Amino acid sequence: AREACNPYYDALPAIVQEYMDKVNKKIGTNYALFNYHGAQDAEHVIVAMGSVNETIEETIDYMVEKTGAKVGLIKVRLYRPFATDAFLKAIPKTVKTISVLDRTKEPGSIGEPLYLDVVAALSDSEFKNVTVLSGRYGLGSKDTTPAQIVAVYNNKDKKRFTIGINDDVTHLSLEVGPAIVTTPAGTVNCKFWGLGADGTVGANKNSIKIIGDNTDKYAQAYFDYDSKKSGGVTMSHLRFGDKPIKSTYLIKRANFVACHNPSYMTKFNMVQELVDGGTFLLNCTWSKDEVEKHIPGQVKKYMAEHNIKFYIINGVKIGIETGMGPTRINTILQSAFFTLTGIIPKEQANKLMKDAAEKTYGRKGEDVVKKNWAAIDAGANAFEEVEVKKEWASCADEGLEFKTKTEGRKDILDFVNNVQNYISAQEGNNLPVSAFTSYVDGSTPIG
């Protein structure tokens, strides 16, 4: 009986393709068991499946446009049963190297599942002499970025590798260059640092709806925070553009960064994620003359060297004056964001925000709605530009404010100072594998 089902598995790929063709005819797509994207004369092709394909596509378009790179991607639409003939037809005849990306780790195996399937499919084909490399990505929900994909295409020698992890123990990781902006021209990348329960996430969800519903722009939002959201750090990643957005990763290079909590200035690297000429908005109670002494040296240095436009706004004061209260600054900062970015004309943005506020808070009464309207009006004009002085370029790096633990058991001291502090500073993804050699069994010290 186990073997009697073979004809059904053999027939399945053709059936799936038949239904894909029906979908394609209905909505104008081109779904196939394996889709190819990239240069027609590609010499290095990635094989992958899942959301990473969007990032790879975006990177290919960037590389082909900038350098004429001969790179491509085969997207696996149907994994099981693996249709070998359809896969081979999707491969460019010019290919010399294939890198297979698996989002899994199979300890003890000679390779991950998709890699082994590709090797088997090629073994009796015209591509049997093509070099096949095996890579792992996305382990532990690590972001896969365009810079990492470029590293995959640049790799010609490392037969087994990982991306997104700095492996200084078994040395499987690829050398990754600096973050690059591969989004289509005209795409605006924005990042907001908020405090859990201050309304920042909710305001940004409203911003996405406003832009998506009232303009012709494509919109995308990711919200990054842990399960203990209230009182913790929240990060909102917003993208807007005139072309489809394929960026399935968090923003590393932003046009606009907003810090809604001034204490974050010494705790996190925020400004350093801005592109040259980007805009930084800081919510604080300091005046234009006072703010300089509260900004760490490395932040001032970066702003001076990269021509950053620096603005401050006193959301606490405005919140009190409009009756919103000192902690509900979300609407105020949202209004300032729309004015500073100009994504929507100021008057239109003002009206749309007020309509959204009425829809959101209408059930709480007219008084609450009017307070939100007042906050929107105030936030649109209350920010001030701070001069970024040339001499800031010579400021020293003061580092992040870590709470170093000095007393207690050695295992606890090591974990707090070498792992936990970096995770708290949102730098955990940069920790090397060697930082975890004492915790390979998954345990953490208790105390």
Regions found by a protein language model. Name each.
Residues 1-102, 107, 112-203, 334-335, ...:
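Flexible, low-complexity linker and terminal segments
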Residues 58-68, 88-92, 115-117, 205-213, ...:
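Short, solvent-exposed amphipathic alpha-helical segments in soluble enzyme
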Residues 76-84, 227, 265, 318:
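Short acidic loop-to-helix transition motifs that present clustered carboxylates
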Residues 272-302, 306-310:
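ADP-ribose/adenylate-binding Rossmann-like module
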Residues 349, 364-447:
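Ferredoxin-type iron-sulfur electron-transfer modules and their immediate structural context
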